[in-house]
Design a protein with these regions (language model features):
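A conserved hydrophobic secondary-structure block that centers on an alpha-helix together
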Residues: 1-29, 37
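Extended surface/linker regions that mediate inter-domain or inter-protein docking
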Residues: 27-38, 42, 65, 89-254, ...
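Amphipathic alpha-helical segments that form the core helices of the histone-fold
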Residues: 8-19, 77-96, 127-133, 338-347
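Alpha-helical scaffolds flanking conserved acidic
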Residues: 22-30, 51-57, 352-353
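Extended, well-ordered alpha-helical scaffold/bundle regions in very large, multi-domain proteins
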Residues: 3-8, 42, 50-105, 119-123
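Sequence context surrounding c-type heme c attachment/ligation sites in exported
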Residues: 11, 17, 176-300, 304-308, ...
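Short, solvent-exposed loop/turn and secondary-structure capping segments
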Residues: 3-7, 40-46, 73-76, 118-123, ...
């Protein structure tokens, strides 16, 4: 709320200009309001120890879960928001009442799906492609995540294994296709593919960075990262394998490539396939970072099964939700919050994990 000092400052502006006319004085007051950083930014200063005020906590709750100012019910309880259980009750209420768009935004940001509508495929290789394909795929992804969080109260294992409805996808492109879990979403396949076909390295980096929160070093200076254009003399795996054999690249690619190659049974549009250019698809792979050696699993579904039970995947989901809801990166002081969110995501539900951030003490503090 506006404090006395702010009101007094605006009153001084008005009083100073009032002799020159009412309209000019009022215009100056409005200009001062519009130029204030508080008009553009949600500024949360807290007290000397970084603890937020009751109204700052109310703002954080409402913007984290509904992306809007606090409603009447939240303001009526503002003096009780120091109680974790009260914050949790309001977080769950806000998610249920107005949080569907917030959840869709979170998943799009986490999984890097923003702007997918502009993705296009090479018409020479995918003549069946149209602008409707990425649009419908994004709608399918939104509906999948919304159903998991709000309708099923699904957990981390469900995120990687639940059946994905394909009703809204263009039938001329996806006739007879079935999808299970986030790794089989066509939207994800397109977002990590080239217009001419799949990109195993992009897919492997995506899994490591976005789903496991691993840090990948950039390519060494002077390394050519371009891949030879596709032709029918070699499969995508063969072309990318040759590219990654450079000794300067092997330290990272030994972690990246096995993941990307396991996803090769899904084409650039996310459709299941068993061959490319008439040659069998080799979708053997692994996740060396998790101790799953290269060659020990085959295909997207097998990879999904491993990630579904990996503690690292649960922690990574928790880290991304903490970043999204608090608007900052996590630090070592957030370790117990991340563990609690990950535990709830695995043992109870994704929604419960989302609510858990509001119940944690870190939600009531400004980190410096």
């Amino acid at each position: 709320p506006v404090d006395d000092a702010e009101l007094e400052g605006l009153a001084r502006v008005y009083d100073a200009l009032r002799p020159q006319g009412f309209a000019g004085a009022l215009r100056a007051v409005v200009q001062a309001i519009l130029e204030s950083p508080y008009f553009l930014h949600l500024i949360q200063l807290g007290d000397g120890d970084g603890r937020l005020s009751d109204h700052e906590i109310a703002n954080r709750l409402s913007y984290a879960f509904c992306e809007r100012p606090p409603d009447a019910a939240l303001l009526a309880d503002v003096s009780r928001l120091g109680d974790a259980s009260v914050r949790g009750e309001h977080a769950r209420r806000l998610l249920s009442e107005c949080g569907r768009e917030t959840v869709a935004t979170f998943f799009r940001e986490w999984l890097g799906l923003e702007g997918l509508e502009a993705w296009s495929a090479d018409p020479a290789r995918f003549p069946e492609f149209s602008a409707a394909v990425p649009e419908r795929a994004l709608e399918q992804a939104d509906a999948y995540f919304e159903g998991l969080v709000f309708d099923r109260e699904a957990n981390m294992a469900d995120l990687y294994s639940s059946e994905v409805a394909a009703d809204g996808l263009p039938p001329e492109v996806y006739e007879g296709q079935r999808f299970q879990g986030i790794l089989e979403l066509p939207a994800l396949a397109m977002a990590r593919s080239k217009p001419y076909g799949t990109a195993p390295v992009l897919r492997g980096v995506f899994v490591l960075e976005r789903l496991l929160c691993a840090e990948i070093e950039p390519p060494p200076p002077g390394i050519d990262t371009d891949i030879a254009p596709p032709d029918e003399s070699a499969t995508t795996r063969e072309r990318w394998t040759a590219h990654s054999e450079n000794p300067a690249c092997s330290s990272c690619h030994r972690h990246i490539d096995p993941i990307g190659f396991a996803l090769e049974d899904r084409d650039a549009l996310g459709r299941h396939r068993v061959e490319e250019y008439g040659r069998p698809i080799d979708a053997t792979g692994g996740v060396p970072l998790l101790g799953i050696e290269d060659g020990s699993l085959v295909g997207t579904r097998a990879l999904s099964e491993r990630l579904a039970v990996a503690p690292e995947a649960g922690r990574c989901f928790a880290r991304h939700w903490l970043r999204f809801s608090l608007g900052r990166l996590e630090h070592e002081g957030d370790a117990d919050a991340v563990e609690e969110l990950a535990r709830r995501a695995g043992e109870t539900s994704l929604m419960d994990a989302m609510v858990a951030i509001a119940e944690h003490d870190t939600f009531t503090r400004r980190r410096r």
